[in-house]
């Protein structure tokens, strides 16, 4: 399920990705229980055959010309991910899919995974756009007190939001000491650390993170004296209170080292599992006390601004849909 829509996603003719509503027009059986034959989706109940556009192609011993279409969702495969547009198909624009340089460039390595989390997708965005929680939720891996002490900058660029935090002359926490060693660098010397969070609506966050030996330029330090990566956070709402969370890390140092990729992935998976527990418990509290007011502090600027962007875009999309319906009436 994506955005409260039950979907079946599969590869049709020519391995092209297709997404249909998970509903057979014959008797309402889930098409996801079917099979793929000759690039078409075959219902596992009575053998009705569906095309990628939602039209019924055939059915054993039955004429199908008058069968109603089911909904087809625009879908594209790029950068190793499937991108589905769950809204009005007439408003789908593939140009809105962000370009991911690290996904197409062999100079980068990527490792990641998928978690199902029982929380509102906006809670995950809040979490990612304010990394002060690392000090407490991830104390044994990436957290340290200097995160709390570093000032945070926040700026809006159109529909995108960027927050940044820089720390100088600190000791690296355990995860980043291991990353320094992975790049063949000393891990017991002072470092400069950075966190730059970039929110792209509706629900994607890319975070530039890293450490460099102190005094070598920090974020702009030469590659041979730093360990840096891009934390990938693609959040797909499932329902109002659950998400599919695609997480990972892309790095440009030693991309050929598959063992290092596996170690980083394992460490990152453990870190994100800590977020999972916190977010699910937070969601339970919010459902139990929906009327209780919540505080907005200085550290919440990233989450607050990202929600404003989402609200503005939702309002604009609804207005566009209303205009389209008006023209069709």
UniProtKB/Swiss-Prot annotation:
Binds 1 [2Fe-2S] cluster. Binds 1 Fe cation. One of its GO terms (biological process) is lignin catabolic process. Its EC number is 1.14.13.82. It comes from the Bacteria. It catalyses: vanillate + NADH + O2 + H(+) = 3,4-dihydroxybenzoate + formaldehyde + NAD(+) + H2O. This demethylase system consists of two proteins: an oxygenase and an oxygenase reductase. This is Vanillate O-demethylase oxygenase subunit. It comes from Pseudomonas sp. (strain ATCC 19151). The gene is vanA.
């Amino acid at each position: 399920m994506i955005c409260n829509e039950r979907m079946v996603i599969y590869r049709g003719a020519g391995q092209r990705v297709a997404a249909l509503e998970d509903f057979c027009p014959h008797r309402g059986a889930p098409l996801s229980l079917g099979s793929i034959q000759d690039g078409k989706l075959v219902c596992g109940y009575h053998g009705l055959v569906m095309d990628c556009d939602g039209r019924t192609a055939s059915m054993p011993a039955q004429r199908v010309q008058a069968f109603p279409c089911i909904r087809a969702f625009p879908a594209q495969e790029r950068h190793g991910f499937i991108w589905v547009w769950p809204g009005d198909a007439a408003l789908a624009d593939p140009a809105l899919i962000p370009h991911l340089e690290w996904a197409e460039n062999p100079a980068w390595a990527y490792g990641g995974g998928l978690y199902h989390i029982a929380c509102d997708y906006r809670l995950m965005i809040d979490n990612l756009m304010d990394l002060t929680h690392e000090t407490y939720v991830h104390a044994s891996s990436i957290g340290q007190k200097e995160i709390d002490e570093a000032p945070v900058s926040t700026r809006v660029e159109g529909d995108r939001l960027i927050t940044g935090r820089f720390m100088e002359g600190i000791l690296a926490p355990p995860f980043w000491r291991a990353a320094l060693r992975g790049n063949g660098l000393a891990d017991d010397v002072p470092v400069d650390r950075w966190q730059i969070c970039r929110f792209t609506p509706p629900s994607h966050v890319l975070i530039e993170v890293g450490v460099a030996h102190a005094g070598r330029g920090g974020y702009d330090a030469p590659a041979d004296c730093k360990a840096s990566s891009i934390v990938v956070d693609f959040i797909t709402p499932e329902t109002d209170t659950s998400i599919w969370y695609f997480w990972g890390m892309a790095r440009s140092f030693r991309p050929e080292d598959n063992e290092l990729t596996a170690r980083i992935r394992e460490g990152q998976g453990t870190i994100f599992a800590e977020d999972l527990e916190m977010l699910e418990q937070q969601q339970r509290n919010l459902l139990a006390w929906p009327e209780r007011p919540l505080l907005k502090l200085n550290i919440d600027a990233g989450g607050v601004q990202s929600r404003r962007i989402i609200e503005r875009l939702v309002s604009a999309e609804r207005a566009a849909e209303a205009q389209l319906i008006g023209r069709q009436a």
